[in-house]
Amino acid sequence: SQVGPLGTPVRLGVIAATDEDPGALRGLGTYGFIKGATGYIAGAVVHGKHNLEDFGYLMERAILFATDLDLGTCWLGGTFTKSRFASRFGVHDGEEMPAVTSIGYDAEQPHLQDSTSRRVANSSHRLPWERLFFEGRFGTPLPPEAVGDYATALLMVRLGPSASNKQPWRIVREDERWHFLIERSFLNVPRT
């Protein structure tokens, strides 16, 4: 168990096929989005005020580690059968499993389904800078030339993946403070 930067305990682990049990991943349910994965990074987080932020932070750290090992990854938030993964991972009462990440070696040639999914999600297009980053308040775009040493970090935020390529994040710089916000759409409503 690890604790996220906002104080929520998070458990992460790997569910993997082995030479002794090559069928270990069968039946987990990814709705056909993942083929040939050798494993999944799964996790559980206790319910709480900042649980999703802490889960996301620690999951992304695990993904960066896997990427450093030359493994391909793919976040799965709405395209996996949570009950099957939760059962396999051992999610306890009072915990939830917001997402899993497939891990494995990237396919040499992308499949038709991959390119179709990317096209439907509009994955090759990103919102323009002025729709993501603001100076002082919404409606006042933050000029790229005004961010100095933060230019690369903000560019990476702009290029980063998001569910269905919605890019829901917005950043408002107010003097020396940076406010990170989520723009919710009718498809991305707050949890109750």
Name each region found by the language model:
Residues 1-192:
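Acidic, surface-exposed loops and disordered segments
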